[in-house]
Amino acid sequence: MKLKNTLGFAIGSIIAATSFGALAQGQGAVEGELFYKKQYNDSVKHIEDGFNPGARIGYFLTDDLSLNLSYDKTNHTRSNDGTGSQKIGGDTSSLTAQYHFGQAGVDSLRPYVEGGFGHQSRGNVKADGHSGRDQSTLAIAGAGVKYYFTNNVYARAGVEADYALDNGKWDYSALVGLGVNFGGNAGAAAPAPTPAPAPEPTPEPEAPVAQVVRVELDVKFDFDKSVVKPNSYGDVKNLADFMAQYPATNVEVAGHTDSIGPDAYNQKLSQRRADRVKQVLVKDGVAPSRITAVGYGESRPVADNATEAGRAVNRRVEASVEAQAQ
């Protein structure tokens, strides 16, 4: 009858567990389990091997490590000391830690090892020459495997070795269990795949930086003269060719003198020099409308008029033209 009640409770637990969507494995999970243990007792105790039903509850400190409280009851076990069959009763409670291997999840196998301590109490036991109630403190070691039917329902099979610290005797057991777990995080979730970065927009082609080209003209004159000397024709021709290449350009031809002589005279002399250079440009193909000839007299010296060398530099016609390179 007790076995039927145990099975009924186990089946009810499974149905309840599968009805809670929040149940899971992993850190923070609580496991509840019903198990049945086959106990192989040390021969010195004169106790037949028996079957012990029990229950266990565990809490996962991490995804792999759980702390467990277990309780099982010794039923239907008898002495075999030759003095008559005596019914043996008692129980065992224990605190153990289980370390699991493998990944939690549906249809997964998780081997485990465990260790801890327990307390065992049995009545009508003859052990090492005495009888009565036997109390033992146990060191427990075990191993096994869990199979998870779902994230919440599992079956367990394992073996345990119990060492009695009081008398140095060993007992062994094999067990099977059926359990459920509640809560937890089902292990570390796989990180969501990093979305592919959006393609960089194709940069608009940069407008090419306009390159400025420039040509300059510097024609020198003899004292009190306005005649363009032959050695300057090439420079004037370069300016004319540049303006032909860039037909949108115009030019100012600026005439200058040194400081010798009256201002009014030098003003007229500088204008004549500018006009002469304009005439050469026109001969080289530049339209007159694109040329402005201006005389500045002695007002814009670029060198010292106190020396002959400086005055020679100041007797000049200047021009410069800029354009954007094609």
Swiss-Prot record:
Residue ranges of the region described as 8 X 2 AA tandem repeats of X-P: 190-205
GO terms for MF: porin activity
Keyword Membrane: yes
InterPro entries to which the protein is assigned, alphabetical: Bact_OuterMem_StrucFunc, OMP/PagP_b-brl, OMP_bac, OmpA-like, OMPA-like_CS, OmpA-like_sf, OprF_membrane_N
Signal peptide: 1-24
Cell compartment(s), UniProt: Cell outer membrane
GO BP: monoatomic ion transport
Domain OmpA-like: 208-325
Membrane topology recorded in Swiss-Prot or TrEMBL: Multi-pass membrane protein
TM regions (residue ranges): none
One Gene Ontology term, aspect cellular component: cell outer membrane
The Sequence repeat ranges on this chain: 190-191, 192-193, 194-195, 196-197, 198-199, 200-201, 202-203, 204-205
Main location: membrane
Keywords: Cell outer membrane, Ion transport, Membrane, Porin, Repeat, Signal, Transmembrane, Transmembrane beta strand, Transport
Role of this protein: Known to stabilize the outer membrane.
Family (UniProt): Belongs to the outer membrane OOP (TC 1.B.6) superfamily.
Protein name in UniProt: Outer membrane porin F
